[in-house]
Amino acid sequence: MMRARAKFAPLFLAGATLLFPPATALGAEQGFTPRLQTPRIAPLGKENRTPEQEAMLASRPDFNIYKTLAHDVDLYNRWSPLGRFILDGSSLPPREREIVMLRMGWLCQSEYEWAQHARIAKAQAGLSNQDIHRIAEGPAAAGWSDFERTLLRMVDELRYDTMISEATWNALRAKYSVQQVIEALYTAAQYQLVSMALNSLGVQLDPGLEDRLPKDGALPAPATQPKSPRLKQPRVPPLAESAWSEEQRKLIAEQKLTGPVLNLYRTMLNHPVLYGPRYKFGSYLQRDSLLPPKTRELLIMRTAALTGAEYEWGHHVEAAQKAGFSAEEIRRIKSGPDAPGWSEEHAAVLRAADELRREAFVSERTWTTLAKYYDTKRLIEIVYTSGGYTMTALAINSLGIQLEPGYPRFP
């Protein structure tokens, strides 16, 4: 049993002004929606599995998250290489990796993510129960090293401001290489996506998980519209073709077939090991998912608007036009689900993106409406598309990826 601690510190930087929304009192009107106590999508039982699902689950632990995601094997297979890299393949020290994961789980109020990674953090990364509780207290809590405070601050900035601040970037670079900063960024972004899925699909705790989200303090605040200006020049410059290694040329070959390589891909070439898993997942969401083109583009462009990712917006205007949206409808995406003119279906899709941004959870009202139009696989892909493009937005904003000339700006 974890002993009671002092109330959690609000999200302050020592000696600085308040950067993020203040902590929300338990039960406050504008706080978090209660999390689900039963699954929205039930884990697959052994008697109902296809050969493809059996193959997917054969190499995974008997956890509810995998048995739930087995409803969409194609999505899982395209996403899991990224997840494996972040969990097992990155160069981040295990303690620092788990601090990042747990902080994001706390900010998203994902009890499953918290319980699983508290277990991993204690067993594999040397964190104590006291350390884990302090993660919920945040960067202002006593006992952190300066760099651990920086990591916690990074997660807070990515959740609330959808980018890493200049001060935090410089503090990260004092210890980490550029590749390691990218890994830390993607670790936070991946576990925001994971939290969105766990919360919205109603994945319930596995037997034997002992840790729970702390209840003896204030909740974190839900996220709102980011306020900081976006970068006007790259922090990580796109890699010039003359500097590409043979490995990087092979990675980028598909993009070269369609013309000049975009800044997004040339920037991500700075981390060739991450490039492949990131592209495999992103290309599924962009081209191969089961979602209708209009649904996909609504999610992508609304997520771009909510995160202040103008690069993402600019590159999807043409795709939205091809999906059948008029210029007026594209402008209306930025106004959100309450703008007049949306169908019930499309308003619910936009509202899902808003709710995932706000509290990493699709509300019962929105889920019920979506379920009138989409089957189980497509419901999962709605969450993953919003979460996946949030991940891309955090990278775009934090790395300073600049929009190429000729692409539309935000209306």
Feature map (PLM): residue ranges:
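Hydrophobic alpha-helical segments
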Residues: 26-411
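Universal eukaryotic N-terminal targeting presequences
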Residues: 1-3, 18, 25
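Bacterial N-terminal signal peptides
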Residues: 10-21
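Bacterial N-terminal signal peptides that target proteins for export
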Residues: 1-12
